[in-house]
Amino acid sequence: MPDLFPSLKYHDGLIPVIVQDAKTLQVLMFAFANEEAVSLTRSTGYAHYFSRSRNKLWKKGEESGHLQKIVRICVDCDEDCLLYLVEQTGCACHEGYASCFFRTMEGEVILPRLKDPADIYSR
């Protein structure tokens, strides 16, 4: 099987990444990665992303301790989107929820908050 890393299609230097819990398949979050983040994710076994708001590379959990250990990386049929299947430590969401998708379009919160965000980032 060929390594698809060289053929990934980045838009403005970024590729979308969907993140799922490897056991439950719950969607945990969505983020972007640049080539360096994808390379670091593959070499370290832990999820790395590129923050558009901070304009920098980041390792998920570097401040909170809520790491994402990579179980598998899948590539979509167009090679322009990645799916990380992970073992999540702690919360995936910086708001203290297991998933960033914790509310409906109507604003109803459908997941319990696991941690107070102030506690997550006061380490």
Curated annotation (Swiss-Prot):
Its main location: cytoplasm. One of its GO terms (biological process) is L-histidine biosynthetic process. Keywords: Amino-acid biosynthesis, Cytoplasm, Histidine biosynthesis, Hydrolase, Magnesium, Metal-binding, Zinc. Pathway: Amino-acid biosynthesis; L-histidine biosynthesis; L-histidine from 5-phospho-alpha-D-ribose 1-diphosphate: step 3/9. Its EC number is 3.5.4.19. It catalyses: 1-(5-phospho-beta-D-ribosyl)-5'-AMP + H2O = 1-(5-phospho-beta-D-ribosyl)-5-[(5-phospho-beta-D-ribosylamino)methylideneamino]imidazole-4-carboxamide. It is an enzyme of class 3 (hydrolase). Zn(2+) binds at C77, C93, C100. Binds 1 Mg(2+) ion per subunit. Mg(2+) binds at D76, D78, D80. GO terms for cellular component: cytoplasm. Its cofactor is Mg(2+); Zn(2+). GO terms for molecular function: magnesium ion binding; phosphoribosyl-AMP cyclohydrolase activity; zinc ion binding. It is found in: Cytoplasm. Pfam families: PRA-CH. Catalyzes the hydrolysis of the adenine ring of phosphoribosyl-AMP. NCBIfam families: PRK00051.1. Belongs to the PRA-CH family. PANTHER family: HISTIDINE BIOSYNTHESIS BIFUNCTIONAL PROTEIN (PTHR42945), HISTIDINE BIOSYNTHESIS BIFUNCTIONAL PROTEIN HIS7 (PTHR42945:SF1). Homodimer. This is Phosphoribosyl-AMP cyclohydrolase. The gene is hisI.
